[in-house]
């Protein structure tokens, strides 16, 4: 799913980068060195990298759909949740419509929000290919996670969802709070907000950013060229933002390597629960995968179902 975000962040936490490491005291100099992290980078450069990382991965919708074509477990989860909670459903970061169209086929009315032009075009094409009854259940709204509005629909959604790490494009506490405030405004009394983000993998976060990882071979769905895919990243441990680079390199060596940026905010479990509570929600269910299993150290995802806290004064 594509993940829209506010262009101007109210808190510049993402720009806090560590300084270049200094030699430690004698008793620490023999310890193994950590892989170099982000820095020293200017505030402006980090902001530019984060902004680019919110857009570039979603500029080629055909490639995006090809890369995630086997991702189905989350769709099954959100379909089951929608069956239990009912519609209409508000979907944040709907992207090209993986989840949207499945929910509409199940008979739910869905308001799908996104801001990435290529993904919105792909979503519209998918909707046009649906049976008429399913297509008519989908309303597409171009909007940002922090400022979206569905006129005439405040307080009307029993369920809001943000699938496939959408909230990892909220880079500051202010952005998280703004997004959750918009969700709260649109939820019906007793309504739920369900979303998933990754459980931070500490070994992955400290990988050497100079190396290439996850090298695989694939055929580009548009050009039909055989490509190598690989990735690496820098990690800002203060802003908790991974600045990821995706490399697309022609196997035959003819032509340049394309580098696509992707930025993701990492949320640790206790922190995430506190952020949700600060925005007037409470976590009513929490899972470690899309098979409804408990969250533990082996999990790759954090799947949360939240409701408005009973004592919240916010609307």
Regions found by a protein language model. Give the residues of each.
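A short glycine-rich, Lys/Arg-flanked "PGG" loop and its adjoining helix->strand segment in the class I
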Residues: 177-189
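Conserved class I S-adenosyl-L-methionine
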Residues: 8-12, 32-87
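Glycine-rich SAM-binding Motif I of class I
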Residues: 97, 101
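Class I SAM-dependent methyltransferase SAM/SAH-binding core
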Residues: 102-148
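Class I SAM-dependent methyltransferase "Motif I" SAM/SAH-binding loop
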Residues: 93-95
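A short acidic, Gly/Pro-enriched loop at the edge of an enzyme's catalytic core
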Residues: 150-159
């Amino acid at each position: 799913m594509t993940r829209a975000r506010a262009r101007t962040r109210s808190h510049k936490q993402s720009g806090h980068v560590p300084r270049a490491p200094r030699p430690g005291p004698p008793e620490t100099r023999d310890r193994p060195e950590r892989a170099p992290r982000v820095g020293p980078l200017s505030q402006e450069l980090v902001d530019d990298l984060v902004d680019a990382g919110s857009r570039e991965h979603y500029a080629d919708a055909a490639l995006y759909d090809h890369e995630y074509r086997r991702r189905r477990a989350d769709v099954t989860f959100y379909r089951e949740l929608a069956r239990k909670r009912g519609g209409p459903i508000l979907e944040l970061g709907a992207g090209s419509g993986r989840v949207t169209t499945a929910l509409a086929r199940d008979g739910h009315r869905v308001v799908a929000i996104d801001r990435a032009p290529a993904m919105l075009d792909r979503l519209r094409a998918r909707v046009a290919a649906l049976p008429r009854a399913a297509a008519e259940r989908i309303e597409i709204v171009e909007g940002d996670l922090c400022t979206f509005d569905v006129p005439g629909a405040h307080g009307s959604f029993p369920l809001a969802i943000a699938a496939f790490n959408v909230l990892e494009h909220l880079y500051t506490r202010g952005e998280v709070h703004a997004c959750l405030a918009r969700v709260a405004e649109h939820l019906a009394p007793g309504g739920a907000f369900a979303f998933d983000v990754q459980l931070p993998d500490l070994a992955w976060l400290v990988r050497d950013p100079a190396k290439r990882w996850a090298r695989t071979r694939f055929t580009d769905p548009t050009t039909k060229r055989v490509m190598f895919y690989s990735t690496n990243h820098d990690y800002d441990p203060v802003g908790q933002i991974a600045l990821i680079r995706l490399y697309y390199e022609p196997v035959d060596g003819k032509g340049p390597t394309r580098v696509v940026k992707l930025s993701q905010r990492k949320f640790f479990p206790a922190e995430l629960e506190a952020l949700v509570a600060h925005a007037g929600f409470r976590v009513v269910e929490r899972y470690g995968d899309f098979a409804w299993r408990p969250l533990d150290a082996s999990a790759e995802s954090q799947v949360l179902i939240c409701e408005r806290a009973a004592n919240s004064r916010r609307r």
